[in-house]
Every structure is written in C-alpha cells, then in structure tokens.
Design a protein with these regions (language model features):
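Residue(s) in the substrate-gating loop at a strand-loop-helix junction
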Residues: 143
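Alpha-helical segment proximal to the catalytic Tyr-Lys
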Residues: 128, 172-176
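The beta1-alpha1 cofactor-binding region of Rossmann-like NAD(H)/NADP(H)-dependent oxidoreductases
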Residues: 41, 62-74, 105
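Conserved glycine-rich Rossmann-like NAD(P)H-binding loop of the short-chain dehydrogenase/reductase
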Residues: 31-46
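Canonical Rossmann dinucleotide-binding motif of NAD(H)/NADP(H)-dependent dehydrogenases/reductases
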Residues: 2-34
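Substrate-binding pocket helix/loop in short-chain dehydrogenase/reductase
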Residues: 99-100, 107-112
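Active-site helix of classical SDR
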Residues: 123, 159, 167
C-alpha cells in the first residue's frame, strides 16, 4: 500500500517534464491522477498510458490553466470524475526570457498569467472542495530563480516569487481547516 492510496491528485502542466515526473511518482504511491495541459496530444496520451500502467485511475484534461472559467470547469469535471480532490500541484509554467529593456508587455503578461494566475485559478476552484473534505494539500512549483532572481528572466522570476508568497498566504488562510500549502523551489 502506497503513501497516497485512495487520494486524488491534480497536477497541472503534466503532459511532460517535471509535471509528468510528479504525476508518475504520486501514481507509484497509489494516487489517482487527474492532469491538465493546454492540449492532450501524443505526449499527454503517452503520459496517461504510463500512469495507467501503475494501476491507478488517470485522466488527462485539455485546459488553459490561465483562464479562470476554463479552470472552474475542469476542476468541477475532475471532482465529478474522481469524487474528491486531495492534492493540487500547481506546476503549469512557461518561460519567455528577455532583458527588461527588450521585454514586451505581452511577454510579461503571458508568463505571469500561465505561471502565477493559473495557480490562483486552481487554488480558487479547489479550495471549496478541500474545505468540505476538511483536508487537502496544495503544492506550488516555484524555482530558485524566484528566490535569487536571474538576469533575462524578470517575468519568470517574479512569477515564481509570487508562487512562494501565494503558498505562504494560503497556508495561513487554510491551515486551520486541515489544508496545507507549500512551495517547492527546484534549482540549478
């Protein structure tokens, strides 16, 4: 029996990369996995197959995590499909690097929307469910760049620093209700 047997985890941005690795690890510990990505293409289908081979329930959902309404819909669908939402991993993220003097407003806005606003969207949608369950775990994937900064990545750095602050604030808001919130900041 694994550490997460009987739990349902949402992992955003998990068709490949770090999100996929998180989903696979959680599944190996017995968690059922609902993962999202902008599209569920061949990568997403392969991720579904790999997770299913571990003997857990899995489904990939096409969703724009930066869109508030899309997120509300997909979270409601996941709750309907899986029955509970016990773990949320806010992993969706992108980079659009550039020096400040050359960075466009669109580069800034897109990175903040995908990396930070998406976490707000998913936390906002999952919080009522977790509150009714009186338990839950929210994990924000930040970065060492959110702590130390990095030249040419002011948008990415700001978004990841925001993920850390968001986790700290949510932990204070929801901790008394049995809901944990943490940030993980992988580094070089």
């Amino acid at each position: 029996m694994g550490l997460l047997t009987g739990k349902t985890a949402i992992v955003t941005g998990a068709a490949r990369g770090i999100g996929k690795a998180i989903a696979l690890k959680f599944a190996s510990e017995g968690a059922n996995i609902a993962f999202t990505d902008l599209v569920i293409d061949e990568n997403g289908q392969n991720t579904e197959k790999e997770i299913a081979a571990l003997g857990v329930k899995v489904k990939g959902y096409a969703s724009n995590a930066a869109n508030f309404e899309d997120t509300e819909k997909v979270v409601n669908q996941i709750k309907e499909d899986f029955g509970s939402i016990d773990i949320l991993v806010n992993n969706a993220g992108i980079t659009k690097d550039g020096l400040m003097m050359r960075m466009s407003e669109a580069q800034w806005d897109t990175v903040i929307a995908v990396n930070l606003k998406s976490a707000f969207n998913f936390i906002h949608a999952c919080t009522p469910i977790m509150m009714r369950q009186k338990s839950g775990s929210i994990i924000n994937m930040a970065s060492v760049v959110g702590v130390h900064g990095n030249a040419g990545q002011c948008n990415y750095s700001a978004s990841k620093a925001g993920m850390i602050g968001l986790a700290k604030s949510i932990a204070q808001e929801l901790g008394s209700r049995g809901i944990r919130a943490n940030a993980i900041a992988p580094g070089f």
